[in-house]
UniProtKB/Swiss-Prot annotation:
SUPFAM superfamilies: Trimeric LpxA-like enzymes (SSF51161). PANTHER family: UDP-3-O-ACYLGLUCOSAMINE N-ACYLTRANSFERASE, UDP-3-O-ACYLGLUCOSAMINE N-ACYLTRANSFERASE 1, MITOCHONDRIAL-RELATED. The keyword Acyltransferase applies. Pfam families: Hexapep, Hexapep_2, LpxD. Keywords: Acyltransferase, Lipid A biosynthesis, Lipid biosynthesis, Lipid metabolism, Repeat, Transferase. It is an enzyme of class 2 (transferase). Its EC number is 2.3.1.191. It catalyses: a UDP-3-O-[(3R)-3-hydroxyacyl]-alpha-D-glucosamine + a (3R)-hydroxyacyl-[ACP] = a UDP-2-N,3-O-bis[(3R)-3-hydroxyacyl]-alpha-D-glucosamine + holo-[ACP] + H(+). InterPro entries: Hexapep (IPR001451), Hexapep_transf_CS (IPR018357), LpxD (IPR007691), Trimer_LpxA-like_sf (IPR011004), UDP_GlcNAc_AcTrfase_non-rep (IPR020573). One of its GO terms (cellular component) is membrane. The active site is at residue 254. The gene is lpxD2. This is UDP-3-O-acylglucosamine N-acyltransferase 2. Belongs to the transferase hexapeptide repeat family. LpxD subfamily.
């Protein structure tokens, strides 16, 4: 079955403009790039990138008009492909993609329309800013505020008194309750924000629910992946810091504070009242126990189980998680011991 092309570039980018993005001087005759492609499939008028030894063979046979390439691979680029040599090929490639396919950078209405659908349910007391798009089936509750040029997808629910900033995208089937959302926030489909935290106490031989009376604060420029859940705080807010990016299927429990510009991969679970500093990176399927502090710029490997605080700037891996050097030393020692048997 042949694949459909869902993103067609209606733009072209001059090679000299790409060179400027990469901080390079452009000394040859200018030419246009009209699309992007993978190393193995890119052709005339298209640009690709390469920065990993896994793709050397594909690089050798690429037919792309141009390639953003790490310095260590520049000699391998075929003669018919123009090389933009940069230490950051993927980052420059991302900027070129944004120029070629601006609609892929910021999601828009699934219906390709602007304005408020007659099939949306908007409470009379809600305040909806200029240029807002609300798709069919979406609901906006009493006293909610939607900032200008925000898009609310089909069947999304914006709860009472929720605040959504400007230029946001709230995907289809998203629920936002008891929350304040900043500007330029992207929330992908199926995500739930502001539901009860998991609070129970054992009393009289049974589990008794502890009312969760906090909220959620999502600061500017945050992106939240599909089917992620962010619980509201028990007494104070659960906070997602400015510029932080959450992947799909991430669980953020009540009272968690995540700092600015963190990246958290899919299936990470962060238990209640844990504090994560700025610029922290967490690999997929990692779990973090409650009431911990993860220092700024720390890195946590995928599938790690974090049971104690992590100092700033350290890299921890394993289950239970420990400093990466200690983990790999212990792993090597076990291998040597196994060979002796």
């Amino acid at each position: 079955m042949s694949g459909e092309t869902f993103f067609l570039s209606n733009h072209s980018v001059a090679a000299s403009q790409i060179a400027a993005l990469a901080g390079l001087s452009f000394v040859t005759e200018d030419f246009a790039i009209s699309a992007a492609g993978a190393l193995a499939t890119a052709g005339i008028g298209e640009i690709c990138y390469m920065d990993d030894t896994k793709y050397i063979e594909e690089l050798k046979v690429t037919r792309a008009s141009a390639c953003l390439i790490s310095p260590r691979f520049k000699e391998l680029v075929p003669g018919g492909t123009f090389s933009f040599v940069t230490p950051h090929p993927y980052a420059i490639y991302a900027q070129v993609l944004a120029l070629l396919y601006p609609e892929a950078t910021i999601p828009a209405s699934n219906f390709g329309t602007n304005g408020i659908s007659s099939k949306a349910n908007i409470h009379a007391s809600a305040i909806v800013g200029h240029g807002v798009t609300i798709d069919p089936g979406a609901s906006v509750g009493p006293n909610a505020r939607i900032g200008g040029f925000t898009c609310i997808g089909s069947n999304a629910v914006i709860g009472p008194s929720v605040r959504i900033g400007r230029n946001c995208y709230i995907g289809a089937n998203v629920t936002v309750a008891y929350a304040v959302v900043g500007d330029r926030v992207i929330i992908h489909p199926g995500t739930s924000i502001g539901q009860d935290g998991f609070g129970f106490t054992f009393l009289g031989g049974k589990w008794v629910k502890v009312p969760q009376v906090g909220g959620v604060i999502i600061q500017d420029d945050v992106e939240v992946g599909a089917n992620t859940t962010i619980d509201r705080g028990s007494m104070r807010a659960t906070v997602i810091g400015e510029g932080t990016k959450l992947d799909n299927l991430v669980q953020v429990a009540h009272n968690v504070t995540i700092g600015a510009h963190c990246v958290i991969a899919a299936q990470v679970g962060i238990a209640g009242s844990t504090t994560i500093g700025d610029f922290v990176a967490i690999g997929g399927h990692a779990g973090i126990a409650p009431h911990l502090t993860i220092g700024e710029k720390a890195q946590i490997g995928g599938a790690s189980g974090v049971m104690c605080d992590i100092p700033a700037g350290e890299r921890w891996v394993g289950l239970p998680a420990r400093p990466s050097r200690a983990f790999f030393r212990q792993f090597a020692a076990l291998k040597r011991l196994a060979k002796k048997k």
